[in-house]
């Protein structure tokens, strides 16, 4: 990142620690489901409800908390959100039963969307316009690192120690982030207060509605399978702790590659590229259970799964913003909620499939089917979209 001001760089680094911690607590559960299920003597499918609860909470509370806090000074809001994050993850680490753990996950998720929205705007306000993309990319790097490193090593620690150790580490990271915010972040009101009531017209745009529907249907297919990726790899490939860690790292590495690729796609090719990525995702889901019985093939398949899964969100989010024509604030907020609704829906459907069939293979069949529904909608969107919107955006840029 080419931001030269040392104080600004340190503030963004602190925000990265916070976003890493929040991303870590979101994804880490998927790597320790077996450990949690064994500790509380419940089915793995029941433990998967933790993923559903978290995603549903983000979906419902993110836009609401953001709107409530949008007129307040950034620093106390960020500190308050991180304080809730710390307490909720400490509650997770000490949870005496599954119900308390589920409640703590819902509480932790309640700050997720608001923190990201406020921190993103705050980071962009600290730098000149030409540096805003670099600032946002650096801050969001926390999520990428959480996916690539935090999840696999969280799974490893969960096996070597226990799942409570993972939440203890997340709590400690939250404390570090909180202290960093106290020391580095200036206390000032937002420069621009969005007029959210003027942005509801975004829902009149057909392509925006298409994008939300594609997100909910298509991306839920990812989480039908990914929610249970850790027990799937144990069962199919026979992986031990080290194998699970390597496979989850491969998924994260694939996610980084897919995200990077998606960021390079020109605006006029958004929907067409999205269709191609979704076809690839369906293909990976369809063959995964058949090739994952071979350890080396399982690693490769997991990498491709991550690449296709994380190649989709940037395309959808860019499509939403490009099609919103002035309602980008509410469009972006609802887009985040749509992804988390897909997360919750996928985890719930996956749990039902696992309970009903007792087979991990059917999870991938269900995931491929849901993604195929998203593919059909993407095709309709491509046939009906106005190319002039993207041509305008390109010429404007």
Swiss-Prot record:
- Could you tell me the membrane topology recorded for this protein? Multi-pass membrane protein
Q: Which residues cross the membrane?
A: 10-30, 48-68, 76-96, 106-126, 141-161, 165-185, 209-229, 242-262, 274-294, 296-316, 334-354, 363-383
Q: What are the annotated GO cellular component locations?
A: plasma membrane
Going by the UniProt record, its keywords in alphabetical order are:
Cell membrane, Membrane, Transmembrane, Transmembrane helix, Transport
Q: Which cell locations does it reside in?
A: Cell membrane
Looking at the keywords, is Cell wall biogenesis/degradation present? no
Q: Does the keyword Iron-sulfur apply?
A: no
> Which GO molecular function terms does the record list?
transmembrane transporter activity
Q: Which CDD domains match?
A: MFS_NepI_like
The organism's superkingdom is given as: Bacteria
SUPFAM superfamilies noted in UniProt:
MFS general substrate transporter
Among the GO biological process terms of this entry, one is:
transmembrane transport
Quote the protein name from its UniProt record: Uncharacterized MFS-type transporter YfhI
